[in-house]
Design a protein with these regions (language model features):
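NAD(P)+-binding Rossmann beta1-loop-alpha1 motif at the extreme N-terminus of oxidoreductases
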Residues: 3, 8-77, 102, 139-142, ...
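Hydrophobic beta-strand scaffold residues
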Residues: 41, 61, 129-130, 314
């Protein structure tokens, strides 16, 4: 395949070749978005069916990393989209083994930025450039585009600019900030070269930490609204239960799907996360199919660690992370200790739930 190569940054019109390793929901949709813009994709996945499906849509399929590399013209670029951790570690090593000096690897998953620094040094010994790219957009990215936070050497990032430009949402995804005139910058188009290796995933890490806090705020607010009718329930006052002094203040049976809808329009708390909350509540107002067990994928923990290392207070983000731990029953034994202490010092028996 002989395609025009990028000779300058910030051009969305230059077509490129790109190998993509990992064809899950995000990897496959990113390939589709790039193909829509005319880029040529060579796809590989450990699942041959995923490769066949994308090949049927116009991608070049590969049954091995060696075949993928052979179908790409030098200098090659390979985008890895696999789960963070050991799988990424193994995949980076395997991809580097089939590349040559001057080629580039992009890790578009949610890797720890410290791992990026180490991996960049390792593959750099082979003359291979390493780019870390924090990717936000999820399953909606095919149509909406992906917000890209990029770290790595200038030469590699500039060469990959047409890929980033095609994946990003574009300037029309949001109103331009007052005072920004002239041609839109890459950041206004939805992608940013944040700095050297690790910077992209560092920014994405904090992005996800903020996401935890925003989600927790919506959840807590909705819980207050859900219980605004507590005054209708008789609460016995005894030594073990604080009385509700004014039950008349809590007589509201609020329609939470409707509250979410009204907040979406003109409210200062409007956001895409609120849009998704409204959609979930429209489908199931009581969310009965959910247990409330909330996972954390690592970025919230890494954000808290960075805040501690920097000496920066982050009570909201850290509490939101701890609430996720609590949702998984990890606070249950601590609660038993509290109950046991009350029994010891005051003879307080537990009340039935």
């Amino acid at each position: 395949m002989a395609l025009q190569r990028a000779t300058h940054p910030y051009s969305a019109e230059v077509l490129m070749e790109l190998g993509i390793v990992g064809l899950g929901r995000m990897g496959a949709n990113m390939a589709r978005r790039l193909m829509r813009d005319g880029h040529e994709i060579v796809a590989y996945d450990v699942n041959p069916e995923a490769v066949s499906q994308l090949a049927g849509e116009g991608a070049g399929g590969a049954s091995s990393l060696e075949e993928m590399a052979s179908k790409l013209s030098a200098p090659r670029s390979v985008w890895i989209m696999v789960p963070a951790g050991e799988i990424t570690e193994q995949t980076v090593d395997a991809v580097a083994a089939v590349l040559e000096p001057g080629d580039a690897i992009v890790d578009g998953g949610n890797s720890y930025y410290r791992d990026d620094i180490r991996r960049a040094a390792k593959v750099g010994e082979q003359g291979i450039d390493y780019v870390d790219c924090g990717t936000s957009g999820g399953v909606f990215g095919l149509e909406r585009g992906y917000c890209l936070m990029i770290g790595g050497p200038d030469r590699a990032v500039e060469r990959l600019d047409p890929i980033f430009a095609s994946l990003a949402p574009g300037v029309d995804a949001a109103e331009r900030t007052p005072g920004r005139d002239g041609d839109p910058s890459p950041s206004e188009n939805g992608y940013l070269h944040c700095g050297p290796n690790g910077a992209g995933h560092f920014v994405k890490m904090v992005h996800n930490g903020i996401e935890y806090g925003i989600m927790a705020a919506y959840a807590e607010g909705m819980n207050i609204l859900k219980n605004a009718n507590v005054g209708k329930v008789k609460r016995e006052a005894d030594a073990e239960t604080a009385p509700l002094d004014h039950p008349e203040y809590y007589q509201y049976d609020l329609d939470l799907p409707e509250v979410a809808e009204v907040w979406r329009r003109g409210s200062v708390v409007g956001s895409w996360l609120l849009d998704l909350t409204a959609a979930a509540m429209q489908e199931s107002p009581d969310l009965a199919e959910f247990t409330g067990r909330v996972s954390d994928s690592g970025e919230g923990r890494w954000t808290a660690i960075a805040a501690i290392d920097e000496g920066v207070p982050t009570p909201v983000l850290t509490t939101a992370l701890h609430e996720r731990f609590y949702s998984r029953g990890l606070g249950d034994f601590g609660d038993k200790v509290l109950s046991a202490m009350r029994k010891q010092f005051g003879g307080h028996d537990e009340k039935a739930s």
